[in-house]
Structure formats: C-alpha cells, structure tokens
C-alpha cells in the first residue's frame, strides 16, 4: 500500500544507493520493514528473511540455507532442517540435492527456469505452475515499489502510496 524509505550512498563515487531502510504498510493492515545494505561491516552476503506475527515467527538466512527457525509464543524455538521430520506439502518436487548439502539462491532461480520450461512445453500442471511464476503484473508492482521508495527518500522519507505511482 505505502512505503517510507531512506536511501543512502555511503561509498563515495558510487552511482547507486548502497544502503536502504524501508518501512512498509500493507493493504491488510500488516506492517513490515526492509533493511538492505552493501556496506554492513562484518556481513558477507547475508540475505535473511524474518516474518514476525502475533502467534510466532519464522526466520531463514541464505548463509545457513539448510536451517530455518520457527518460534511460537510460549514455546521453545524449533530449528527446521531440510530433510528433517517437518515436511511441507508440495516442496519435495523442488528439492534438487540430498539433505545436508546447501541449497538456496542458485537453485531458486533454477526452479523458476524449470517451471517456466514446463509451462512452455505445456506440461499437465501448467495452471498450477503459472501461479508460482513471476509475471508482468509482479514486475510492474516491484517497479512501483522501487519508484515509490525513491520518491519517498527524495521527499524526506514521507509516506508514499504505491497507487500514486504511474
């Protein structure tokens, strides 16, 4: 729905922002935040996704791709591992290598390419695969998000509604 962004270039001479803090308001009332940096001291190429809710949290990091942490209020946190006892329906077909070997960033793109090839070849589950693949509307929405973030940052981080972005 809307964003408030602070984009900064810390490295002199760099043409693009190398650090961003973005607050997000979603249509359903949920809120989120993004912290993105190419200049975070001590980090290598850390990509972490954390989702926090009123009943629990889920956290995954690219630097440890075989593990996710699941926490429920009032319960000890659980480490979920690839190939462990917790199975997620529909994911087995997307696993390319045995448990214990890291799987993540490159395999995610490989899965998109594989699903797109299946759609092009008219496989039986084409409609289901199309729901998982990024499409032009997804791309337009991401471009609106980026433009709204730049506009917000250029206007002292004022909240910017994505619907105002053309």
Task: Map each language-model feature to its residues.
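C-terminal helix-rich "cap/oligomerization" subdomain common to oxidoreductases
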Residues: 111-166
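Short linear motifs in exposed loops
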Residues: 35, 61-62, 162-163
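Rossmann-like dinucleotide-binding domain that binds NAD(P)(H)
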Residues: 1-43, 137
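A residue-level signal for beta-strand positions that form part of recognition/binding surfaces
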Residues: 48, 57, 159
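C-terminal glycine/acidic-rich active-site capping loop/insertion
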Residues: 1-7, 21-26, 55-133
